[in-house]
Structures are given as structure tokens and as C-alpha cells.
Design a protein with these regions (language model features):
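N-terminal Rossmann-like FAD-binding beta1-loop-alpha1 element of flavoenzymes
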Residues: 3-29
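Short hydrophobic core segments
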Residues: 6-8, 183-195, 331
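Active-site substrate-recognition segment that forms the wall
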Residues: 16-23, 46, 85-88, 194-311
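Glycine-rich FAD pyrophosphate-binding loop
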Residues: 22-42
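Dinucleotide-binding Rossmann-like beta1-alpha1 core, especially the glycine-rich loop
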Residues: 46-128
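Short beta-strand to alpha-helix junction loop
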Residues: 59-65, 97-106, 144-163, 263-267
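Helical element adjacent to the flavin cofactor pocket in flavoenzyme catalytic cores
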Residues: 143-180, 187, 191, 197
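C-terminal catalytic lobe of FAD-dependent flavoproteins
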Residues: 282, 286-359
Length: 359
């Protein structure tokens, strides 16, 4: 009889783990009280490393680059499972933009830093910028194109992975898990993000709140950009990610001491609207379809906590703003760790992401 696995947490990280484990022979139950996937449902879905290449976060950039390389195989596996993936990819490239002289200096520093990791965004003129994003306003002073760093529709992705999981035999349970000791399973994976400390003592994650906007395009408005647009705009960061019916605009980010405080903050929404419509004036013609907010679980060093806590429990939390990007590599590591009878994993990330480093 197959060994029993309980995956607690139904976002994209937990769902991909459940799907991969079931394909590896585990009798898997996915415990997802929030059927929408909580943080996954309010994400931009960017698969970009260049936009995350901040000096001082080298290890996080290395992890993001390693994770990015897993995406073609993930999409191919979904296709091979009979899952329709046509609506998942929404952009293939990323355009990095700066507004004033301070923003240009910041962007140049990021681009120079990326060269050490063999990531070399291409400097583009205004015509090339507008080719990728026709709505760009005249205030955009500098641009770099990152070919091959696109984005997915986060909600379409989660639906596809859940469909693949069901086809692989995963059982979905929506009742909230309060104690992992009560689960009828040989192995347990905890992928509950900011709520992990409720289930496992000593898991150190901090909840950061962020708002996003979903804007729908009326027939008379300009079309969405072809690429992801990530801007340093008058000292703030803003991104615009295309969707087939509009765009996602994001995202604010700040610490919150109250995990129940998930309502969008007026100031954050106002900042996003101002920055997005200055960046792309044509967005003023779009309609506000949704204002969302969610919690991102972060760690002290920026790297997620992925690994064993004991012989029965594996944790996969703390992915911060990179949960979707890094989910395939996280799942690969976790599924490898689940087989306690096999030799230790050769992946260098097993040691670097060890959750005991935060204890």
C-alpha cells in the first residue's frame, strides 16, 4: 500500500507539492481550507529574477534563478497530464523602467549587480520600450528589456495544478487543520505561509501585507502591455502585469502585526493608482475590477524555510514575494526529502534552506 501524505496549505506551493508527490506514488491529501489559495490569488504571477535582483540579497537571487529554470518542465508536465495550460503564460519578457534621475541611478545599480550572475538586461530606447508597452507615458526615462522573464496568470496556474492533482489522485479537504498530530498520515508537509507558526513551534516567519489591483480593459481602451512592466517610479516600486482581459497592478509591501488585518489600506491603493496611471496614462481608461490584499510570509534572511523538522514533518514556508516563481523548485526539494529511506538529497539548497536555521 502507498504511504500516506498530508499537505497542509492549498496555495501554489502546497498544491504543486501535492501534485508532484502523488505522481511519485504517495497517497496524498491536500488540506486547503481556503479553496482560493489565499496569497496565490492576490499575486502578480511574475517569473522574474532581474526585477528581484537587489544588492545584498544574492542568495535569494541565486535561488530565484535556479527556480526559474524549472518552469519549462513544470508546464510540460502539466501538458502531459492532460491539463490545459494555454491560459497560464501571459507574458514572455520583462521591461524594467525608471522615471527620474534617482530612479535611473537605482536601476543602473541593479543592472550592474545582475551582471555578476550572468543576467544582462538589454538597454532599450524609447521606441523599443513603447513596442513592448504602448501605453508608456513620456516620463519613462530609461528602460531595460529582460528576454525570457515573463509571467503567469496566478489563478489559472492554481486551477491547472489543482486539476492535475485531482487527476493524479490527490484528495482535497477543506476543513481547517489545527494540529498536525491529528492527521492520519505517514508524512506531513506544512505549506501554510504566514500561519505556519500556528502548527509548528519555532518556525520564524513574519507576515508582510501587500495590496494589488486588477483592472479590466473596456473595448475602447488601449491594450495591455505585451511584457511585464516593472518600474522604479519616483522612489517607489510598481509593476503592471498583463492579463487577457486587463492588467494586474502591484504591489505595496509592509510589515503587519495583525494577520487578521487583510483589508486593503486606502493609502496603499492610492499609491498604486497614482504610480500606475503616471507610468501608463492609458490605464486611466480601465475599470477597477478588484482591489485585493494578502499576506506574504517572509524570513530574516529572505530565503524560504524548506526542509525537515522531524522524521514525520517537512516545512515549506517563507517564500515572501517569490512564492509562485520558486514553487517548482520548492516542490522538487520537498518531494525528494519525503522519502526517508533514500540517501540524502544532493541539492545544495537542502542545507541553505534548512528551516532549523531560524530556530
Amino acid at each position: 500500500m502507498s504511504a500516506r501524505l498530508a499537505v497542509v496549505g492549498g496555495g501554489v506551493v502546497g498544491s504543486i507539492i501535492a501534485w508532484r508527490a502523488a505522481r511519485n506514488g504517495w497517497r496524498t491529501t491536500l488540506h486547503a481550507p481556503d479553496i482560493t489559495g489565499a496569497g496565490t490569488s492576490v499575486a502578480g504571477g511574475m517569473l522574474g529574477c532581474a526585477g528581484e535582483g537587489r544588492p545584498g540579497e544574492d542568495a535569494l537571487l541565486e535561488f530565484a534563478l535556479a527556480a526559474r529554470d524549472r518552469w519549462p518542465a513544470l508546464l510540460a508536465d502539466l501538458d502531459a497530464s492532460g491539463v490545459d495550460t494555454a491560459d497560464i503564460m501571459v507574458a514572455a519578457d520583462t521591461l524594467l523602467i525608471a522615471a527620474d534621475s534617482s530612479d535611473v541611478g537605482h536601476l543602473r545599480a541593479v543592472v550592474d549587480h545582475l551582471a555578476a550572475f550572468d543576467v544582462r538586461p538589454e538597454s532599450v530606447d524609447r521606441d523599443r520600450m513603447r513596442s513592448a508597452a504602448a501605453m508608456l507615458g513620456s516620463s519613462a526615462r530609461r528602460g531595460y528589456l529582460v528576454t525570457g522573464e515573463g509571467a503567469v496568470d496566478n489563478r489559472a496556474l492554481l486551477a491547472a495544478v489543482r486539476s492535475g492533482a485531482r487527476s493524479a489522485g490527490v484528495t482535497l479537504e477543506t476543513e481547517k487543520v489545527c494540529r498536525i498530530g491529528d492527521l492520519d498520515a505517514d508524512q506531513v508537509v506544512v505549506a501554510t505561509g504566514s500561519w505556519a507558526p500556528d502548527l509548528i513551534e519555532g518556525v520564524s516567519v513574519t507576515a508582510e501585507k501587500g495590496e494589488i489591483l486588477r483592472l479590466s480593459r473596456p473595448p475602447t481602451a488601449p491594450p495591455p502591455p505585451d511584457a511585464v512592466v516593472r518600474a522604479r517610479w519616483r522612489g517607489r516600486s510598481v509593476y503592471v502585469v498583463p492579463r487577457r482581459d486587463g492588467v494586474v497592478v502591484g504591489a505595496t509591501q509592509y510589515e503587519t502585526g495583525d494577520r487578521d488585518d487583510t483589508a486593503p489600506r486606502v493609502g496603499g491603493v492610492s499609491d498604486l493608482l497614482i504610480d500606475a496611471t503616471e507610468l501608463m496614462p492609458g490605464l486611466a481608461e480601465y475599470r477597477v475590477a478588484e482591489i485585493g490584499s494578502g499576506l506574504r510570509p517572509t524570513t530574516a534572511d529572505g530565503l524560504p524555510l524548506v526542509g525537515r523538522r522531524d522524521r514525520r514533518t517537512v516545512v515549506a514556508v517563507g517564500h515572501g514575494r517569490n512564492g509562485i516563481l520558486t514553487a517548482p523548485l520548492t516542490a522538487e526539494i520537498v518531494v525528494d526529502l519525503l522519502d526517508v529511506s533514500s540517501p540524502p538529497s544532493a541539492s545544495p539548497w537542502v542545507a541553505r534552506l534548512d528551516p532549523r536555521r531560524s530556530a
